[in-house]
Amino acid sequence: MTKAEAYDKAWRLGRKGDFSLVDEIYHQNYKSIDYRTGIEANIEDDKVIVSTLGESVVFGPSKALFEGEDFVCVEGFAKRQLNVNDPSYGIMMTALSYQDGKIVSQKTVSSDLDFDPSEGKDWNWEDYE
């Protein structure tokens, strides 16, 4: 399994309450800063955030844009279903830095999309629910 695949699988399992792979691939010194708020988060904070998303967000397919020994960049799509009849869509890019083979920091940026990224593609949201 590549680093990008492990990252994707870890958080998909985490959304189901299984954080064993998250614990395996993250460094004990991991931290992330949300520059919008200035808040520093550790891996336990990230687990709480993922656990509270519930069914309101569906994460679609992701792919590695770059994968090296100490750095990985992953792109992924999300569908936010805050209103049953009015979903919104986004694209995210996550930069992962590694130390001793484990994720020591990450930064995610996202942008809203004004279209459904699954349209005309060989995947659908139901595959990821």
Predicted regions and their residues:
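C-terminal and inter-domain tail/linker signature
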Residues: 1-129
